[in-house]
């Protein structure tokens, strides 16, 4: 049963990541530094994908594309959440980071054990901090990626009247 679960989870989670990648790759280079809304959504999607894949959660999160935490309401316009990128990273940097995080996800799912399925991803001690079983944080993460991939596709349609096609499933299997 675990094998079927891991295979199904990866093919769909990988497809969500591939959808995000396709949207980022399609965004015209000419708009990369001028239309920061697209960049900030793409960055947020990637940084949170990596963050939620940091299992077990230890509170430490070194990112390949560094950020600074900001106080609520102090973020630059368009930034989602409190992780503000230290600069506008290039499309190439973003795609490389996404490829590395995709592999991190694939390997994690491939090596997932029954024992790990019982563990919890706990963000912190506060009442409203996230506290999920490992399978649930993986589903949550996949939904989060797909949500923002859809937002990027909408921005693509608005800006260039084009968007990537549907990704049915990821190619590689765990």
PLM regions and their residue ranges:
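Acidic/histidine-rich alpha-helical segments that form the ligand environment
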Residues: 77-120, 135-146
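Hydrophobic alpha-helical core bundles mediating ligand binding, dimerization, or RNAP-core interactions
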Residues: 13, 17-20, 24, 98, ...
